[in-house]
């Protein structure tokens, strides 16, 4: 049995932190896992900047409410979900993902959660498990699933390499150059065809 595991940001929706960086006028928040592979380091740094500027969950959610899925993402996901089982694996947080999942037709997402004070300040975050994407893929494999994975970033390489088929999608030139063995696509139709061929 097959199950497709997709990254969310950069694959199905724009990068939330880049959108928030532009909305808030804080260029430092543009850094993502494409730039910093150590997610804990990246999140600790982000939370420090939010605190410094007095920004909390509400401000980020206001930005997320204005974000639409990437053009073609919902049609791609609809067709893929009609063909096989799909789970979105993301390092994002439930508090960020919900409005985006609604716009994508409520696919299943495995992600993390934020710790938020009563005043809306984001005080920390709770990862579902260590190396959550790779741990999830290995768990799915342990219960009889063959995984097919796609993502755009450093933190997707583990699931791509551990799966029976894996693809980079809308990735950086650096990651593509470092991993020429991984097929890379820019268009949803091409990714859909590659996934269907791997089923």
Regions found by a protein language model. Name each.
Residues 1-2, 150:
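Short loop/turn microsegments at loop-to-beta-strand junctions
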Residues 111-116, 171-175, 189-191:
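Short, acidic/turn-prone active-site loops that include or flank metal/cofactor-
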Residues 194-199:
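Short amphipathic alpha-helix with an adjacent loop that forms part of the alpha/beta core around
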Residues 2-113, 117-118:
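Alpha-helical substrate-recognition element adjacent to the catalytic core
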Residues 78, 138, 157-158:
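Alpha-helical segments flanking ligand/cofactor-binding loops in enzyme cores
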Residues 86-91, 145-186:
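Acidic, Mg2+-coordinating phosphoryl-transfer loop and its flanking beta/alpha structural elements
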Residues 95-147, 178:
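Substrate-recognition "cap/lid" segment bordering the active-site pocket of phosphatases
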Residues 94-98, 156-157, 192:
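Short, well-ordered alpha-helical microsegments
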């Amino acid at each position: 049995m097959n199950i497709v595991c997709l990254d969310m940001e950069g694959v199905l929706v724009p990068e939330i932190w880049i959108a928030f960086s532009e909305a808030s006028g804080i260029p430092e928040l543009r850094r993502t896992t494409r730039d910093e592979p150590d997610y804990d380091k990246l999140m600790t740094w982000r939370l420090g900047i939010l605190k410094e500027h007095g920004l909390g969950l509400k401000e980020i959610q206001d930005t997320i409410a204005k974000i639409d899925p990437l053009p073609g993402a919902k049609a791609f996901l609809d067709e893929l979900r009609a063909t096989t089982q799909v789970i979105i694996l993301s390092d994002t947080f439930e508090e960020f993902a919900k409005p985006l999942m609604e716009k994508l037709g409520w696919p299943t997402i495995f992600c993390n959660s934020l710790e938020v004070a009563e005043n809306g300040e984001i005080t920390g975050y709770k990862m579902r498990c260590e190396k959550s994407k790779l741990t999830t893929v290995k768990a799915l494999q342990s219960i009889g699933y063959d995984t097919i994975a796609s993502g755009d970033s450093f933190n997707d390489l583990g699931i791509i390499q551990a799966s029976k088929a894996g693809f980079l999608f809308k990735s950086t030139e650096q990651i593509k150059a470092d991993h020429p063995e991984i097929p890379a696509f820019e268009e949803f139709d091409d990714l859909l065809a590659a996934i269907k061929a791997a089923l």
